[in-house]
Amino acid sequence: MVFSYTEKKRIRKDFGKRPQVLDIPYLLSIQLGSFQKFVKKDPEGQNGLESAFRSVFPIKSYNGNAELRYLDYKLGEPVFDVKECQIRGMTFAAPLRVQLCLVIYERDGSAYNTIKRTQQQEVYMGEIPLMTDNGTFIINGIERVVVSQLHRSPGVFFDSDKGKTHSSGKILYTARIIPYRGSWLDFEFDLKDNLFVRIDRRRKLPVTVLLRALDYTNDQILNTFFNTVVYEFKDDLLFMNLVPERLRGETVSFDIKANDIIYVERGRRITSKHINKLKADNIIKVEVPLNYLMGKVIIKDYLDIKNGELIVAANTEISMDILHNLVKSGFNIIETLFSNDLDYGNYISETLRIDSTVTRFDALVEIYRVMRPGEPPTKEAAEYLFESLFFLEERYDLSDVGRMKFNRSLQRDDISGSGVLTKNDIIDVIKKLIDIRNGKGDVDDIDHLGNRRIRSVGEMAENQFRIGLVRVERAVKERLSLGDLDVLTPQDLINAKPISAAVREFFNSSQLSQFMDQNNPLSEITHKRRISALGPGGLTRERAGFEVRDVHPTHYGRVCPIETPEGPNIGLINSLSVYARTNKYGFLETPYRRVCDGKVSNDIHYLSAIEEGDFIIAQANTNLNKDGQFIDDLITCRNKGESGLFRKDQIDYMDVSTQQIVSVAASLIPFLEHDDANRALMGANMQRQAVPVIRSEKPLVGTGMERSVAVDSGVTVVAKRGGMVKYVDASRIVIHVNVNEISVEEAGIDIYNLKKYVRSNQNTCINQRPCVELGELIKKGDVIADGPSTDLGELALGQNMRIAFMPWNGYNFEDSMLVSERVVQEDRFTSIHIQELSCISRDTKLGPEEITSDIPNIGETALSKLDEVGVVYIGAEVVGGDILVGKITPKGETQLTPEEKLLRAIFGEKASDVKDSSLRVPNGICGTVIDVQIFTRDGIKKDKRALNIELTKLNQIKKDLGEELKIFESALFDRVYALLISSGVKKESLLDMNRCAWLNLKLKDITKQNQLLQLSHQYLDLKRIFEEKISIQYQKITQGDELAPGILKVVKVYLAVKRQIQPGDKMAGRHGNKGVISKINPVEDMPYDEYGVPVDIVLNPLGVPSRMNIGQILETHLGMAAKGIGDQINLMLQQHQEINKLRKFIQKAYKLGVGVRQNIDLNTFSDLEVLRLAKNLKSGMPIATPVFDGATEQEIKELLQLSGLPTSGQITLFDGCTGEVFERKVTVGYMYMLKLNHLVDDKMHARSTGSYSLVTQQPLGGKAQFGGQRFGEMEVWALEAYGASYTLQEMLTVKSDDVNGRTKMYKNIIDGNHMMEPGMPESFNVLLKEIRSLAINIELDD
């Protein structure tokens, strides 16, 4: 196996047996790919901005004398980069400029045909937020994610109510045509089997109204939907043209005979035998009695041959009179429609009878009345409305997806076609619905992933942009009609505000544009891969039923069956499976290996849920021989959503990987296959809540996915190109790029600036640390710096803790955990949290607020941490209530008493007209100030502190850019030096000269002289770029800030809070095994083993059997084995044993296992590399046990044996308090524990006095409102149950919300009089007012 430089430092032993056929794809491609489609120019105009422009332009004026054409668009460069936008609270966006052409026409006869004038102009159309490299958006300085939506695909869907609508249990069938844009069209049967249509879920109409509006007459309608039965009078006898198949299942009321042969006797039911006999004898006509014709329905209008009068209208039931009239008028052949009760219902015929419309105009008016109730219909308005509903491209669009789904549903050969509906489309849908009602065909499964598609960020942004463009279109049309065309320019016509507003509205306030979950790298990556069924055009929590939320067979390999939130959103918010991707139509696809004649190839095919239904697919854990052929004859496979046994020659495809069905978070749970699904769900969700700790530690037992997640999440720094580490410190890494990766015009230096102590969205700390050393050689793609929760380029959410499963004095009751004091001392779970506190200075009606250190009635001590401007120093340690930014607000003059006037006159005290509104540290928080940012409105003089901060920033930038320039110069002059030496210039003479003079030397060799000239130009360019960068940065830093109206100054103070683990904090493993810390126990009291090594955490063994998450036990055993191997290596290192011995032992550990795919040959490693590997393994050999393909029980035992530990995984423990041995052996091992972001510090809260609710006069609730306790309903019940009436009266009055009573009580207590006078509680007044609001007056007698 080939390892990268970083991987070689610490190789994870992989227990996976199945070959890795397909690498894990880039995990953020769903976000980046979709947005790329949106901003990238599409020459065909199918996607993105190009598609939106082409769909709206050209915009023509109402009278056709002018039009505005679209030519091209261009996205500019953003003014501020991502980091600057976050600091300044701005949106990371690029300006959109569009090339438009205004064409003015001249009247040529009756129409405008001749072009009079054209004018091209570039027009600004607002800003488009850009996606960062990690798939996020910076909106108003906040990092947000746009979640993909799983919505009902456009197309046609056939469904039924499953008999739930009516008490009779009759199944009513419906069809619904859903466009991508436009009106919905529903067809539905009622209880009487009449067929109705609804447009946009309005009042229903008989379906024949729609058909009549489509210009169908009664007989055309009947002929379209029914077969014809022809009856003929011959010699006073009535004959029927026979189609034998139609008689199946009928009981005949007469003998069917021909040529004197009786084929079916009267009263017999016609079977296949009779039909075959009739067909065999080629019987095409049979005699029928006259009464057989009674009640049959005529299929066409019969007109009098002489005068054209209507004798019988189509859809009339035949009676003797009608028959007599027809025969009398010379009609010997009578055509009726064919129907029966079994499989040819006469639904359309019955519907025609309840249809009151006669002409097309009647039908159009009826539709107009439904769509526009109250408006008087005219012929033109009714026609235009109907036309625009389904047949105009501007108003209706099925989209490519919709047309494809529509045509597939109707079994058409061609899957492409028009975006609008045609007559045939509507007719075919009605025909299929009638067929389903007749028992031919099935309804669709709406939860099938072939009927639900993914709408990603690019598509949603495009739709929103189109909405903005449509708003602009209306304004442009009006301006073209009203304005003076000779002076109008495209710039005058376009107002960018509606477009900006539409885009801003989407990114700021859409339900799918969400505040990014930035707890740790996994929560980031999961949030970006999330798929929501909620949001605009989707479902709502309240209306979503069980079926939509449930796992569907088509989710296999596309959507994770495990990871979904608990609570009201369960099943509505899902996560994308590891290998899933979307196809061009937006449907989810998953990869499979092609199987040919029982042999599995490495040919990968991606199949959507629709395509997958046709194939038989084997699972990834199916046994194969070396040639890739199936070993077993009968193999468990999936076909059409069901599992079954199939012969190996029947199989079409095989799964790519065992982890194909789960999401990223679920694939990080080792031994997932041994956990109950409910607990696995909790485990997957809780990993996302893990807080990054100060020192991340890789999991001893992992799944092999850790590296992919860490790299793809973007929190680590990955080398763009290979090379040698030239410089490294805590905040910067410089790499000298390999010669073969350098282009001619550049210096060949890559500089990586690391993030230091940045606040995340969840107030956790983002800090990057280099993991390379000076002089190391690295390759492209190597991890060169770790971020939060990563360790040597692997995801590290928690810590490996030595745990024991045993009860301990009741401290692990109900999932509690007993934790050793050593864990706290070693800072294993200590995390840093960064709080941002803002102080805003506004311009008020009474005058501007002022940020100052001169605050009235505040002592010197309280101001000791502020500078002269009134802003806290960096490095100050502050606690709750401390002033961070001093601020005074003007207040209105109050009427002064004579005494106050006298005092003011004597002492000249003027401070009373301002009040203290300083920013203070919230209660319960204590930390260190790590940064202060000051933003001042443009045009307002900056204070001393703001200028100092500016100066510091400028100096830092000059220093950084100067160092960058130095590095680039050094690299460039190295190349110049090499060139001059190779040209024969002496080394001594070069060293005596100034380096810049080297560039002016003249060389004999013309080629080398040209190269020197090129390097000289590069040097000048470097200098110029450096100067430009400094001037741009200077301008950015010194310019005023764009603040909201009325805001003069904003001061942001950043506090770093260090949180150690303490009782009340929530911790969890990866298997849904969560609990709260009950006690931090002294290390000497913890249970210890025979070597005196204490355990770190004691867990309750009763937490395992009922929860059925046995994965945690296996993880504990394997963790113990991994640590044992590390201990053995550590011992060898301490004894300074020779490298070969070390190499052999490590090689033996890596080789262990049956049929594992990993093949590591340590003989290819140098001694230095083996030594470095051993040093990294001494804390434990990291192990990967992939989901559904992990380590077996036997392999765990073998590893335990190799590490010299008992294979039972249990050891003898001693009580730390008494020193006595415990009665039986205890399961001890290493489990990866996470500290979750549910810290007791954030939840604990105390109050003595505080704010009250204005209405009820009771304390507010919750920590955020600094709330208190109220004596609530249930507490009242408790006192009532005890009959404690005096206590109850006291609680409900003076101790609660009797305002006067509690004031009197306070005075009485001060006076030493312990009497109480209960009054009227405020909540009783609320009740009285509620009752009065119902117009019932209640008055109380005194």
From Swiss-Prot:
CDD domains associated with the record: RNA_pol_B_RPB2
One GO location term (cellular component): DNA-directed RNA polymerase complex
SUPFAM superfamilies in the cross-refs: beta and beta-prime subunits of DNA dependent RNA-polymerase (SSF64484)
EC number: 2.7.7.6
Known role: DNA-dependent RNA polymerase catalyzes the transcription of DNA into RNA using the four ribonucleoside triphosphates as substrates.
Subunit annotation: The RNAP catalytic core consists of 2 alpha, 1 beta, 1 beta' and 1 omega subunit. When a sigma factor is associated with the core the holoenzyme is formed, which can initiate transcription.
Protein name: DNA-directed RNA polymerase subunit beta
Gene, per the UniProt record: rpoB
